[in-house]
């Protein structure tokens, strides 16, 4: 059986780095141990306690290989030119402009391309080849020359963002919709499925706060996005990121924020839900800043609410030691039970910061 390499450094390698970055890969690779039975290619040494912990939940002993033939698990890296095109924020920006979804989007390829911007409007400047949620900064009309030093760059109006959500589109056409939790710097902190058995926009917590006609327009836009990207030649799954924003007191949808042609944290959250959700419908994948507790202590702390196979209810500690974030999977019958579980988790770990609300 060929091993898998969790190449979470996918964008970095795709857009320039010639060598893999193990530290990035090791920050996420352990997630594969819970949802993929194949051996994991890794130079990291996992403790016997952690490997047994994974086995207790999956029923299979994880196999770690230091050297082996492998295939990439996060992003393909088999058709570099196509993958660069599909993952570039330039392609999504061009589609936003063409379809009139965000006319204040600007693709700046040199200092000669600086557009005339609205006075007082703040803009988000993105590296078109950066990792999702990274390599961005704020700019205004008056500081373009001093702020933007490298090109190309995508310039978009900074909107009053309220909630983030995505659709993951599988190769067979199936779409799953979920809410993403991000912090004030747009860094990913978790994914919530209110009903992973019916992962549609209608299940989003904020769905009914937005006009139905706006959702209809969004659905047409989503169909167009999928059509355009499929026509461009993609062969595997991809995510379409969107968000809700407030405009003069009215909630609206930014149809297309970006597209990620690779595995995503949202897809991982869905796969965890399928594996551990059972008859329960609400699930959440949660990241918190690494606590001062080691793995053993953290596992012991949350033992009163640890997930059990009999009921598929509770919390699973996913992360080992030596990682930047503690990661948890939460499974509950419904929102009421989920809120209670999260409350209990917070009380058991009072020093941890939980940005997720159910």
Language-model segment annotations:
Residues 21-120, 130-131, 140:
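Conserved N-proximal alpha/beta basic substrate-recognition cap immediately N-terminal to
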Residues 139-191, 243-256:
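Phosphate-binding site of ATP-dependent enzymes
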Residues 84-161, 170-173, 196-221:
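Active-site nucleotide/adenylate-binding loops and adjacent lid/helix of ATP-dependent enzymes
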Residues 188-252, 288-311:
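A long amphipathic alpha-helix within ATP-dependent nucleotide-binding catalytic cores
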Residues 167-224, 260-286:
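ATP-dependent carboxylate/phosphate-activation module, predominantly the ATP-grasp catalytic core
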Residues 1-20:
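Nucleotide-activated donor-dependent transferases that construct or modify glycoconjugates
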Residues 278-358:
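Peripheral (often C-terminal) accessory segments that flank ATP-dependent C-N-forming ligase machineries
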